[in-house]
Curated annotation (Swiss-Prot):
Zn(2+) 2 binds at residues 520, 525, 538, 546. The lineage of its organism: Eukaryota, Metazoa, Chordata, Craniata, Vertebrata. It is found in: Cytoplasm. The gene is cpeb1. InterPro entries: CEBP1_N, CEBP_ZZ, CEBP_ZZ_sf, CPEB, CPEB1_RRM1, Nucleotide-bd_a/b_plait_sf, RBD_domain_sf, RRM_dom. Residues 222-243 are annotated as: Disordered. This is Cytoplasmic polyadenylation element-binding protein 1. It comes from Danio rerio (Zebrafish).
Amino acid sequence: MAFSLRENPRLLNCLDSDIPALSTCSNADAFCRMNTMLGNSLDLSGVCTTPTAKCKRDPFNDRPDSDLSAVRSRMLFPSGGQDSSRGLPDVNNWGLGLQSLSLSDWERPWSSHDTDPSVKTNTASLQGILGTPSQLTNKLSNYSDSSIGATDFLEKFPGMARLNSQSFLDSHSISPVDSETSGFSSGSDHLSDLLSSLRISPSVPFLMSSMQRDPLKLALDSRMDHSSSPLTPPPSASPSGSLSHRWPGASIWPSWDLMKTPESPFSIEREAWLHRQAASINEATFTWSGQLPPRHYQNPVYSCKVFLGGVPWDITEAGLINTFKCYGPLSVEWPGKDGKHPRCPPKGNMPKGYVYLVFESDKSVRALLQDCTEDLLHPEGYSEYYFKMSSRRMRCKDAQVIPWVISDSNYVSCPSQRLDPRNTVFVGALHGMLNAEALASIMNDLFGGVVYAGIDTDKHKYPIGSGRVTFNNQRSYLKAVSAAFVEIKTPKFTKKVQIDPYLEDAICQSCSREPGPFFCRDKTCFKYYCRSCWHRQHSMDILSNHRPLMRNQKKRDAN
């Protein structure tokens, strides 16, 4: 039995004067049709008196049907276990819909309280009509348990026969990707078409309006410009694919102050930590290409720690110690979480494919290298060492041994030159094949005036992936700081390094009273700040996108 929504006397009666509020509602026709389909079981006396706007386009009506159906399913039937507490929302949950009404005063971490009054009025009226998601779910659940029988229901609504009752009432879909399990997406076309005319959610651009002040936060501007629906994450939703690559000013890592208020005691530290990882997602402003300086050693002294790469996947710590104990007592450091190197593999995880061997003497390292196969790289004069090792399931596998010559940690071009820390930059994300002399040569070619370069090392005098470069003039220093990211291309590797001002322990340069552990590298500030002065200085919108720098406390503790 076909069910028509066009010529229905019930629908016409729904718009008479018995429900005066409904006659002035912009969604009156849609609500009446829904009420008719549900057997006039809905009480429409509380419908808002929003004036009808015939010419205003709804942004949701321009979206593909597949996206809309999935959003409606999530709006009308939210998951019971969904957490509505404040926090960083998942990109898949930006179709807020009715779920947002359960939050008092729209207290989203990114939303501004200075919103348009007309929008607030519409939001309040919608809340009065539809209630909270739980109330709406209870109404529909009570209706499904009423006296109407299953046979009568299917005769009255034949389109509902295709619906899965479990997914209809207990939909847990939180993403448009899961829309196949949604009741509305797989059910009646009439109901889907009907709901397309309802405005039951504020537009996504309105929700994101206050975030436009900081173009570096999550790159929302570029995401909203995609041809796909803003409710559906693009394929390149990873940080490296979705963030813009702009500089100067600040790191463009996702702003963690979305999770915390600006006064949170950990938000600045989190921003500084994220900035130290920014080289992987920012484009280089300078590129250096060429050959590294040749190396010539006479009786080199090695660090007692070596890198062992390409180890068998099933290797164990006992197997490593048994293999290398003939060269002297040693311990094994496995790559672990949070930049640490625990003495055993992470539980439940496979080894990472490389380990560090720590001997008690550099003589053990020298003996190990003598038993390795040496591959000399020309013209750099850099040797690669390979050691044949076996495991229970792999036989005779070449593992690369990378030692470190202690003299490679420092390079001074002019011993009589006084080193000024105010003209020193920090260089992060260094490649393991870069020694101090090579770093100095590259920086001097790009910026000029290099008098010193040093590679940061741990307690075993093994490099940790960062270094320092000192210039003899401020112009070269500022040019290097402004460059921020430099790509180094050699015949053996290509690596992008990150350049920041070298930080010292300093007093806040704003109040001159408290310690200033936070440094703003933007040229409009370029000062050390204490926590309160940082918030005071950067509370203005024009400065809110500045990101802090901090000294690496873990590195200092390791040394």
